[in-house]
Amino acid sequence: MAMLNDTIYALSSGAPPSGVSVIRVSGTLTRDILFQLVGSVPAARTASYRTIRTRYDQPVDSGLVLFFPGPNSFTGEDAAELQIHGSKAVLAALFRELGDIPGVRMAMEGEFSRRAFENGKLDLVEVEGLADLIGAETEMQRRLAVEQSAGGVSAIYDSWAERLTRARALIEAELDFPDEDDVPGSVSDMVWADMARLRHDIALHLEAASAGEIIRDGFKVVIAGAPNAGKSSLMNALAKREVAIVTDIAGTTRDVLHVDLDIDGYLVKLYDTAGLREAEDRVEIEGVRRARVALRDADLVLLLVDMSNPIIPADLEQALPHVTVGTKKDLIETASDRYDLQISTTTGEGLPELRDLIGRVVKERYGGQSLAIPSRQRHKDSLAKCLAALDAAISQGSANLELRTEQLRLAAEYLGRITGRVDVEQLLDVIFSEFCIGK
């Protein structure tokens, strides 16, 4: 990122108007800025009530000013926060003053966090956890983000990297000093036994990645069935608002509709699909095609069957995993045991039980485990490459020790790419672009 030596500023709180706005400043000119705006530098990490003035001594506003000397700040640089009234006019006036100071500019997306990374205050996993915490909408997303941003996952990767480094050091010592008494005997046996245990630990960790992805990106539930089975009515009932158009005309839904739900702290992505049948209308044919794609990608299928006219499309007879839901219970007199659950969107009967069932399915598959798990595809990719390098090192028992040691070096490098301990310059712009300006 260019201009890392500039001093930067940005609004780090919500958009105005608001009761209070927080302006964040970071860089070598922070002290000079405070002298110009409030007349002096407040005591470190102490809130001081000050009047903020222009260079012409005109008051802009009054508020709390805090100074954080580097390296003991979020960014590792001298930094400050100005807590002022959240008026658009007040912010515009303050930004004019800041923008007119040479060497001071508005921050770019994620630049405060980028500087924290560059100055060793955060690693990449912690940065991503912070971004996820800011964007968290469910309780499980919050918990996962806290685990990542607090360094719990990074500590695991660092400990694994240390084991790889020690293994390489012991092997190289044996290669360089084969006759020295202070090199432990049978070092190869010790190293490869530990590497086998490490491989097992990483494999188990990688298996948990699906839980991290579900918590972060959502558990996909697809509502499917024949036309007029009540799919759109169920989506509207679970969303508690009108997401889909509901009519008595078969084939009303032509596209895949989507709504996010919070069920027991998990993000559940609910999809309403076109009724599955042999369609002739070109638009409906495309809708049915998209419905089949959604079914293929689903974590759970709710197979809806109109109990007053039970039809199960052939596409859905073998759909797994699925829950068979009988609909329009208010229109039948005799209950049937062929359904996992029976509901009526008209009366609301069975809807709480359906929400509970979805929650149980998610928790049975992904709950009850540590949240120190991979949460992003790039984590999975690097862990898989690390595992492959370890496999190569362990399995090539007859190979030259130097070649096997090189595989251990590659395994450590892939781990380092997750946290940013090794060169990941090409990743940084992508990662930090996820932040808003003031973070």
From Swiss-Prot:
Chain residues that bind (6S)-5-formyl-5,6,7,8-tetrahydrofolate? 24, 81, 121, 439
Protein localization: Cytoplasm
Q: Which GO CC terms are listed, alphabetically?
A: cytoplasm
List GO BP terms, alphabetically: tRNA methylation; tRNA wobble uridine modification
Tell me which residues bind Mg(2+).
232, 253
UniProt GO MF annotations: GTP binding; GTPase activity; metal ion binding
User: Which cofactors?
Assistant: K(+)
Q: Give the note describing cofactor binding and stoichiometry.
A: Binds 1 potassium ion per subunit.
On assembly, the entry states:
Homodimer. Heterotetramer of two MnmE and two MnmG subunits.
Family statement drawn from the similarity comment of this UniProt entry: Belongs to the TRAFAC class TrmE-Era-EngA-EngB-Septin-like GTPase superfamily. TrmE GTPase family.
The UniProt function text for this chain reads: Exhibits a very high intrinsic GTPase hydrolysis rate. Involved in the addition of a carboxymethylaminomethyl (cmnm) group at the wobble position (U34) of certain tRNAs, forming tRNA-cmnm(5)s(2)U34.
Query: Per its record, how is this protein called by name?
Result: tRNA modification GTPase MnmE
Q: What is the organism of origin for this protein?
A: Rhizobium etli (strain CIAT 652)
Provide the organism lineage as a comma list: Bacteria, Pseudomonadati, Pseudomonadota, Alphaproteobacteria, Hyphomicrobiales
